[in-house]
């Protein structure tokens, strides 16, 4: 059996680097305006509805197709 040679090394320095990287990103962020928030919410809602509609169409096809083929 092949042994894994990967040994993760977590050090205080590597943890500090990750925290600094996250803080740098957080400093660049800002609160979205109401208009930006509404636009993002609308786009996300349309995406969710589209995925649901596609799933429903696939469900209907998979349940109705065997009945159509059997006739």
Swiss-Prot record:
Gene3D superfamilies hit by this protein = Preprotein translocase SecE subunit
Any GO MF annotation of the entry: protein transmembrane transporter activity
Q: Which UniProt keywords apply?
A: Cell membrane, Membrane, Protein transport, Translocation, Transmembrane, Transmembrane helix, Transport
User: Which GO cellular component term is one of those annotated?
Assistant: plasma membrane
Task: Give the subcellular location.
Answer: Cell membrane
From the UniProt record, give one GO term of the biological process aspect: intracellular protein transmembrane transport
Q: Which SUPFAM superfamilies match?
A: Preprotein translocase SecE subunit (SSF103456)
Q: How does it sit in the membrane?
A: Single-pass membrane protein
Family matches, as InterPro entries: Prot_translocase_SecE_dom_sf (IPR023391), Translocase_Sec61-g (IPR008158), Translocase_SecE/Sec61-g (IPR001901)
Query: Any transmembrane segments, and where?
Result: 43-63
Against Pfam families, the record matches this protein to: SecE (PF00584)
Question: This protein's superkingdom?
Answer: Archaea
Keyword Transport appears in the UniProt entry: yes
Assembly and partners are described as:
Component of the Sec protein translocase complex. Heterotrimer consisting of SecY (alpha), SecG (beta) and SecE (gamma) subunits. The heterotrimers can form oligomers, although 1 heterotrimer is thought to be able to translocate proteins. Interacts with the ribosome. May interact with SecDF, and other proteins may be involved.
Q: Which family does it belong to?
A: Belongs to the SecE/SEC61-gamma family.
Protein task: Essential subunit of the Sec protein translocation channel SecYEG. Clamps together the 2 halves of SecY. May contact the channel plug during translocation.
UniProt protein name: Protein translocase subunit SecE
